[in-house]
Amino acid sequence: MEETYIDTLDPEKLLQCPYDKNHQIRACRFPYHLIKCRKNHPDVANKLATCPFNARHQVPRAEISHHISSCDDKSCIEQDVVNQTRSLGQETMAESTWRCPPCDEDWDKDLWEQTSTPFVWGTANYCGNNSPASNIVMEHKSNLASGMRVPKSLPYVLPWKNNGNAQ
């Protein structure tokens, strides 16, 4: 039994192609060869069915039900299904012990207790006092000296902006 199992895993083992009996293919290349040969022999491909447990098994359509009941790879799949259903039955979700940490902040309360109005750019700032500085409207400041402005175009001409002239 052990030799048979090792023999099926040997990547250098030669396998016979189900589409062309003259083809002997190494096991490691067999899946690729099956795809190629299936395309080259559509008449034979229509007569064969693929095993649902191992795509390397190409069986005549009349014998597929017998093959499914006796396929060696079926036991691996069935064992996986059994193990999966057992593990699902044993797994129970542990109830979370996480608790929200205590919080001293109340942002809603802070908003209502706030005495000053929020800062808005370009509007008068009324902070409760009537000083002349508090009634000044904020203006946009520039780092340029007065009388200077930012250039409206780049100092060079980009190749794709050549005023529509083709080169």
Swiss-Prot record:
<dbReference type="Pfam" id="PF05253">
    <property type="entry name" value="zf-U11-48K"/>
</dbReference>
<feature type="zinc finger region" description="CHHC U11-48K-type 1">
    <location>
        <begin position="14"/>
        <end position="41"/>
    </location>
</feature>
<dbReference type="GO" id="GO:0007283">
    <property type="term" value="P:spermatogenesis"/>
</dbReference>
<keyword id="KW-0677">Repeat</keyword>
<dbReference type="GO" id="GO:0000049">
    <property type="term" value="F:tRNA binding"/>
</dbReference>
<comment type="function">
    <text>Required for spermatogenesis and is involved in the suppression of retrotransposon transcription in male germ cells.</text>
</comment>
<dbReference type="GO" id="GO:0030154">
    <property type="term" value="P:cell differentiation"/>
</dbReference>
<protein>
    <recommendedName>
        <fullName>Gametocyte-specific factor 1</fullName>
    </recommendedName>
</protein>
<keyword id="KW-0963">Cytoplasm</keyword>
<dbReference type="InterPro" id="IPR022776">
    <property type="entry name" value="TRM13/UPF0224_CHHC_Znf_dom"/>
</dbReference>
<keyword id="KW-0479">Metal-binding</keyword>
<dbReference type="GO" id="GO:0140991">
    <property type="term" value="P:piRNA-mediated gene silencing by mRNA destabilization"/>
</dbReference>
<dbReference type="InterPro" id="IPR051591">
    <property type="entry name" value="UPF0224_FAM112_RNA_Proc"/>
</dbReference>
<comment type="similarity">
    <text>Belongs to the UPF0224 (FAM112) family.</text>
</comment>
<feature type="binding site">
    <location>
        <position position="17"/>
    </location>
    <ligand>
        <name>Zn(2+) 1</name>
    </ligand>
</feature>
<keyword id="KW-0221">Differentiation</keyword>
<feature type="binding site">
    <location>
        <position position="51"/>
    </location>
    <ligand>
        <name>Zn(2+) 2</name>
    </ligand>
</feature>
<feature type="binding site">
    <location>
        <position position="71"/>
    </location>
    <ligand>
        <name>Zn(2+) 2</name>
    </ligand>
</feature>
<feature type="binding site">
    <location>
        <position position="67"/>
    </location>
    <ligand>
        <name>Zn(2+) 2</name>
    </ligand>
</feature>
<dbReference type="GO" id="GO:0140965">
    <property type="term" value="P:secondary piRNA processing"/>
</dbReference>
<keyword id="KW-0744">Spermatogenesis</keyword>
<keyword id="KW-0863">Zinc-finger</keyword>
<keyword id="KW-0862">Zinc</keyword>
<feature type="binding site">
    <location>
        <position position="33"/>
    </location>
    <ligand>
        <name>Zn(2+) 1</name>
    </ligand>
</feature>
<feature type="zinc finger region" description="CHHC U11-48K-type 2">
    <location>
        <begin position="48"/>
        <end position="75"/>
    </location>
</feature>
<feature type="binding site">
    <location>
        <position position="23"/>
    </location>
    <ligand>
        <name>Zn(2+) 1</name>
    </ligand>
</feature>
<dbReference type="GO" id="GO:0071547">
    <property type="term" value="C:piP-body"/>
</dbReference>
<feature type="binding site">
    <location>
        <position position="37"/>
    </location>
    <ligand>
        <name>Zn(2+) 1</name>
    </ligand>
</feature>
<dbReference type="GO" id="GO:0008270">
    <property type="term" value="F:zinc ion binding"/>
</dbReference>
<feature type="binding site">
    <location>
        <position position="57"/>
    </location>
    <ligand>
        <name>Zn(2+) 2</name>
    </ligand>
</feature>
<dbReference type="InterPro" id="IPR036236">
    <property type="entry name" value="Znf_C2H2_sf"/>
</dbReference>
